[in-house]
Curated annotation (Swiss-Prot):
Cofactor: Zn(2+)
Organism whose genome encodes this protein: Anaeromyxobacter dehalogenans (strain 2CP-C)
Reaction(s) catalysed by this chain's protein: (S)-dihydroorotate + H2O = N-carbamoyl-L-aspartate + H(+)
Name assigned to this protein: Dihydroorotase
Gene3D superfamilies linked: Metal-dependent hydrolases, Urease, subunit C, domain 1
GO annotation, biological process: 'de novo' UMP biosynthetic process; purine nucleobase catabolic process
Function recorded in the entry: Catalyzes the reversible cyclization of carbamoyl aspartate to dihydroorotate.
Record lineage: Bacteria, Pseudomonadati, Myxococcota, Myxococcia, Myxococcales
A GO cellular component annotation in the UniProt record: cytoplasm
Residues reported in the UniProt entry to bind Zn(2+) 1: 63, 65, 155, 310
Family in the record: Belongs to the metallo-dependent hydrolases superfamily. DHOase family. Class I DHOase subfamily.
Designated gene of the protein: pyrC
EC number(s) given by UniProt: 3.5.2.3
Superkingdom field: Bacteria
Length: 433
């Protein structure tokens, strides 16, 4: 039998190549060999019937927490990669807030080795901005880049020192690395646990004002202007942050941004409606309806470059506690497409823009070899059933985490097949390879 794979009959949506229509995708030797309306194929060729499906570049997630090393009870590189391909993601960027923190080559190399052993999604490590993510001394950026890191972050913690952030932008620029930053002023956050507003008041919970994010975004944009370093704002959640990024781009500054599905779909009123469910607790918190509207508009008009999940698995021990004491974060790799397809159905996004924000957009931000079905590109492909509807059963998730606000909800759209390097690594209804 031929080792060539023909994906036939599907609607190919490849924003990077300007393609949107029924095409055949030909994969040979792990690469995209051809995308065309008519293709002659051998009788013994392998065929994937994609009729009534979307065929897109594999999704790229700039922001996941794989927890390994040190917190394997929450997630491992292997289980996180399995969750990724189940959701259509063929490449994920692993945040450095592991134990120990990924601030050196040894941790980076361990993550890469675990990813290679899993043989599922491609994993791109993100190194720490500061040693131990302590915010006091810069990590060794040259060592981190040489060992395989594609960006730098102290995610989970802001860089509170403006002087250190300035030096980080300067140092990272010398190595061609972007900083992907968690923006919050801890002095304004205080002991807040959800968005500051009427919902927090009704629940009797301490609030976090939107300005805690806004002031840090504005500070770091000013430092970009000073240094010329590249800034990527992680999990944007406020209207003020969207405005600041839009203005920075208008001025030609190297500033990009991402937004999560939950910050596009849920508000602080959902926290109240949940009855203190800790599946609705994350950082940044779910914001107001006005903030959600601004984030949707920012994604639609390109102010925000990418959809990123901030996939953050936790154990029941860390979530099944009082709201104030619960860990922040939810799992998102297996629900991202479905949640965001809901935005398309609401008219907030076009189908093309949704695919672009999951593929070419994030690939451009970190300069990754992904997000395209161009001839010669790695054959990383997602096949999607946009008409499917399903009910989320946490017990059926591939991730170790069960912390999701969409438990028991009806969702639209499923990934039926995921291909990495020409290999089918996920097929709906079958165990992943």
């Amino acid at each position: 039998m031929s080792d060539v794979l023909f994906i036939e009959g599907g609607r190919v949506i490849d924003p990077a190549g300007g393609v949107d229509g029924v095409r055949t995708v030909v994969i040979r030797d792990g690469k995209v060999a051809e995308v065309a309306e008519r293709v002659e194929r051998p009788r013994d060729a392998r065929v994937l019937d994609a009729r009534n499906r979307w065929v897109t570049p594999g999704f790229v997630d700039l922001h996941v927490h794989l927890r390994e090393p040190g917190q394997e009870y929450k997630e491992t590189v292997a289980t996180g990669a399995r969750a990724a391909v189940a959701g259509g993601f063929t490449a994920v960027c692993a945040m450095p807030n592991t134990k120990p923190v990924n601030d050196c080559a040894a941790v980076t190399e361990l993550v890469l080795a675990r990813a290679a052993a899993a043989g599922l999604a491609r994993v791109y490590p993100v190194g720490a901005i500061s040693k131990g993510s302590g915010g006091e001394e810069l990590a060794e950026y040259g060592e981190l880049k040489a060992s395989g890191c594609v960006a730098l972050s102290d995610d989970g913690r802001p860089v509170m020192s403006s002087a250190l952030m300035r030096r980080a932008l300067e140092y990272a620029r010398a190595f061609g690395l972007p900083l992907t930053v968690h923006e919050e002023d801890l002095h304004l956050v205080g002991k807040g646990v959800m968005h500051e507003g009427a919902a927090a008041t009704r629940l009797g919970l301490k609030g976090i004002p939107s300005q805690a994010e806004d002031v840090m975004v504005l500070r770091d944009i000013a430092l970009v202007e000073l240094t010329g370093g590249r800034l990527h704002v992680a999990h944007v959640s406020t209207a003020g942050a969207v405005r600041a990024i839009r203005e920075a781009k208008r001025r030609g500054l190297p500033v990009t941004g991402e937004v999560t599905p939950h910050h596009l779909a849920l508000t602080d009123d959902d926290v109240a409606a949940s009855g203190y469910s800790t599946d609705f607790k994350m950082n940044p918190p779910l914001r107001s309806a006005d903030d959600v509207r601004a984030c949707r508009e920012g994604l639609a008009d390109g102010t925000l470059d990418a959809i990123a999940t901030d996939h953050a698995p936790h154990s029941a021990v860390e979530k099944d506690v009082e709201f104030d004491a619960a860990a922040n974060g939810i799992v998102g790799l297996e629900t991202a497409f479905s949640v965001c397809l809901g935005l398309v159905r609401e008219g907030a996004l076009t189908e093309r823009r949704l695919v672009e924000a999951l593929t070419a957009g994030p690939a451009r931000v970190f300069g990754l070899p992904a997000g395209t079905l161009a001839r010669g590109a790695a054959a990383d492909v997602a096949v999607l059933d946009a008409a499917a509807e399903w009910t989320l059963d946490p017990a059926r998730l591939q991730s170790k985490g069960r912390n999701t606000p969409w438990k028991g909800r009806r969702l639209a759209g499923r990934c039926t097949h995921t291909i990495v390097g020409g290999r089918i690594v996920h097929e709906e209804g079958k165990a992943d390879r």
